[in-house]
UniProtKB/Swiss-Prot annotation:
Top-level EC class as recorded in UniProt: hydrolase
Places the protein is found: Cytoplasm
Family matches, as InterPro entries: Pept_tRNA_hydro, Pept_tRNA_hydro_CS, Pept_tRNA_hydro_sf
EC number assigned by the record: 3.1.1.29
Organism: Paracidovorax citrulli (strain AAC00-1) (Acidovorax citrulli)
Protein family: Belongs to the PTH family.
Keywords of the record: Cytoplasm, Hydrolase, RNA-binding, tRNA-binding
Keyword set includes Ion transport: no
Disulfide cross-links: none
Composition skew (Low complexity), residue ranges: 201-213
Protein name according to UniProt: Peptidyl-tRNA hydrolase
Disordered, as annotated region: 187-213
Pfam families membership: Pept_tRNA_hydro
Amino acid sequence: MIKLFVGLGNPGPDYDATRHNAGFWWIDGLARDLKVHLVPERAYHGLVARANVNGQSVWLLQPQTFMNLSGKSVAALARFFKIQPQEILVAHDELDILPGQAKLKRGGSHAGHNGLRDIHAQLGSPDYWRLRIGIGHPGVKAEVANWVLKKPSPDHRTLIEDSIAHSLKAAPAMLAGDMDKATLLVHTTKPPRPKPPRPAAAPVDAPAAPGDQ
């Protein structure tokens, strides 16, 4: 089961609504669902909450180290409570996924994401779960730094919030250790709305009788 849920972002009001803080938004939603409150914990360099799920302690963490040093916070809590990498899930913004979509995976590269890069280094392993929350790509690599530190458009914000709400429905499966089910739930999007029935074709007039012409 997942014992440590981490959301990545940058601390402070200047960053609250930026794309890079999508991971924080996800943890905020999970905290609401579990009815716990995040509080500052200096020992773990972040905002922390503890939930009890079926007699098991589960931790929620928002590192307050700024993105590039996220691993310092994650490793501090994980090592103290002897949580293994495969028992950790990190929710983060993902450039290569469109707004409105999210993907769940275990392991793999950090793909240039500086928060993941530091978690890799501090844990000494890439073998943790990632919930990749789509924020879209600006289309030009040189614009990425500005893109992630800006607020999404209202339409994109709604799409991101929708994907967060949808992926949070997989949290019970994550807590139960059924990651196959969790993956299926995250990756299964809402079915398209059925198309309205086509109007019935207008009746074809019968040909006039010879005597009627």
